[in-house]
């Protein structure tokens, strides 16, 4: 029997000694969704962030008390502080809470508390978490299960990255970047892949990262389910260590659920799903690339295990409207002689960038790819430097913005000027270094040709570039057409 909203709220209200929940950095992608769910559950929520944004405005419209800037008095009425890994103990709000002996909990611990009374489905992996979580939420909704979800990106169909549902299901991303996913105790866990990223958390020890994923899977109850992508060599390596029921997925013949006959036509990808003891399923997703086929397979594995019928699976996947900044097509820039397809993508690891480039080549093989890329973090650029040089060389035209620091100090030789020099030395193309974001539009104008695909790629403030270009008069735009997030 599906529990009513009141029944679920009554259970969650076992946090009965907690009145006001205060989020430090409430505008962050991982924080705002949890705050929104708690608001919808009837909690008093406040939060602070360094600057106002559409996210903080949305939360304020739901009743959250928002403070701009971090000050000790912001946490005066809090019964618990929720912090992300980016917030340290020197934050004045955290210092005040510690002095007053108010609990300070990581974001994942609050998510775990929400998951405690629900059937939790947690999606982990270095790449593909947001899209896979979104696909699962879409299929569960199509199956009439009305899940609660907390996602790291905006689900376009819902217009939000979090939603309180009326069923027992909670679908959420599980973040390995700070190992905080170990707080979660889901019923079902997905691991999409395991790659060398955020290695500072694991003291540069890849074996420690692998062990942490195994520990995460062992947070499942003995009757839980691990859904694992065996196309990934590291996931395949840890599979014998996982002492829980498993379903595997991938393209290889040994996967429990696999895809064959994959073909791409522009944005849409078609494939056939082969499942053990079930009829083949003809499927399509409105997303390009083999990596998204794998994300869909994880979704199908869980949906089948939960008893969702094939009609709902097909409907939820084929009608999926995408996630913000995951190969998001903004439309066309107008230049002399025709249009240029404008795409925005969040991927910032070499493997993610390579998957996007492969998707572009697969869906539009006869079109030039013009890429504006912003590296994210100096440490990532340093650690994966040669991979970036090789993969970025596959664009036809490349503009490189300076590294988005994300709080890090510059590292000599791990900056975009160095990347430009190294890419130029390979001889495939001559990249252009862009010192200021405001210079991008006039630099692009003479470079673009009708029919090009313009890809804005990265996780930093490049996220504001696509809407800025779309409304730029240089490309036939109107300044009022799209809300702009300014670039420096």
Curated annotation (Swiss-Prot):
Highest taxon of source: Bacteria
Keyword terms, alphabetized: ATP-binding, Cell cycle, Cell division, Cell shape, Cell wall biogenesis/degradation, Cytoplasm, Ligase, Nucleotide-binding, Peptidoglycan synthesis
Main location: cytoplasm
Subcellular locations according to the entry: Cytoplasm
GO BP terms in the entry: cell division; cell wall organization; peptidoglycan biosynthetic process; regulation of cell shape
Pathway(s): Cell wall biogenesis; peptidoglycan biosynthesis
Tagged with keyword Cell division: yes
Coiled-coil portions: none
Enzyme class: ligase
GO molecular function, one term: UDP-N-acetylmuramate-L-alanine ligase activity
Enzyme Commission code(s) on record: 6.3.2.8
GO cellular component: cytoplasm
Binding residues annotated for ATP, in chain numbering: 125-131
Catalytic reactions on record: UDP-N-acetyl-alpha-D-muramate + L-alanine + ATP = UDP-N-acetyl-alpha-D-muramoyl-L-alanine + ADP + phosphate + H(+)
Keyword Mitochondrion among record annotations: no
Known function: Cell wall formation.
NCBIfam families listed in its UniProt record: murC (TIGR01082)
Family: Belongs to the MurCDEF family.
Protein name: UDP-N-acetylmuramate--L-alanine ligase
Native source species: Azotobacter vinelandii (strain DJ / ATCC BAA-1303)
């Amino acid at each position: 029997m599906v529990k009513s909203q009141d029944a679920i709220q009554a259970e969650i209200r076992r946090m009965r000694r907690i009145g006001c929940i205060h989020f430090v950095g409430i505008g962050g992608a991982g924080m705002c969704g949890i705050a929104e769910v708690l608001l919808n559950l009837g909690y008093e929520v406040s939060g602070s962030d360094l600057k106002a944004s559409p996210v903080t405005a949305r939360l304020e419209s739901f009743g959250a008390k928002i403070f701009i800037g971090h000050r000790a008095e912001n946490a005066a009425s809090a019964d618990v502080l929720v912090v992300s890994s980016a917030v340290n103990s020197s934050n004045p709000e955290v210092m005040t809470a510690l002095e007053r002996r108010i609990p300070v909990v990581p974001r994942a611990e609050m998510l775990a508390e929400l998951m405690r009374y629900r059937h939790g489905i947690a999606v982990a992996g270095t790449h593909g978490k947001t899209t896979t979580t979104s696909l699962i939420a879409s299929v569960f909704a199509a199956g009439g299960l009305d899940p609660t979800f907390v996602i790291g990106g905006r689900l376009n169909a819902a217009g939000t990255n979090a939603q309180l549902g009326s069923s027992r299901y909670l679908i959420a991303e599980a973040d390995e970047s700070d190992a905080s996913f170990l707080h979660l105790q889901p019923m079902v866990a997905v691991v999409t892949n395991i790659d060398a990223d955020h290695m500072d958390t694991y003291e540069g020890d890849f074996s420690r990262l692998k062990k942490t994923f195994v520990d995460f899977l062992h947070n499942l109850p003995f009757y839980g389910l691990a859904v694992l992508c065996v196309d990934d060599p590291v996931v395949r390596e840890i599979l014998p260590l996982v002492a829980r029921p498993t379903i595997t997925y991938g393209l290889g013949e040994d996967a429990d659920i696999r895809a064959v006959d994959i073909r791409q036509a522009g944005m849409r990808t078609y494939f056939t799903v082969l499942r053990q003891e079930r009829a083949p399923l003809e499927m399509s997703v409105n997303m390009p690339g083999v990596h998204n086929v794998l994300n869909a397979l994880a979704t199908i594995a869980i949906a089948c295990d939960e008893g969702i019928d094939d009609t709902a699976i097909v409907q939820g996947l084929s009608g999926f409207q995408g996630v913000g900044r995951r190969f998001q097509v903004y439309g066309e820039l107008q230049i002399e002689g025709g249009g240029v397809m404008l795409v925005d993508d969040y991927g910032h690891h070499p493997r993610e960038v390579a998957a996007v480039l492969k998707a572009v080549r697969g869906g539009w093989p006869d079109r030039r790819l013009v890429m504006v890329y912003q590296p994210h973090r100096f440490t990532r650029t340093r650690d994966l430097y040669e991979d970036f040089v090789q993969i970025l060389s596959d664009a036809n035209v490349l503009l490189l913005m300076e590294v988005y620091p994300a709080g890090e100090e510059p590292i000599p030789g791990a900056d975009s000027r160095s990347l430009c020099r190294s890419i130029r030395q390979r001889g495939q193309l001559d990249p252009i270094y862009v010192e200021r974001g405001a210079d991008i539009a006039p630099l692009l104008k003479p470079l673009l040709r009708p029919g090009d695909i313009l890809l804005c790629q990265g996780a930093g403030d490049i996220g504001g570039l696509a809407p800025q270009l779309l409304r730029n008069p240089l490309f036939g735009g109107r300044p009022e057409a799209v809300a702009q997030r300014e670039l420096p």
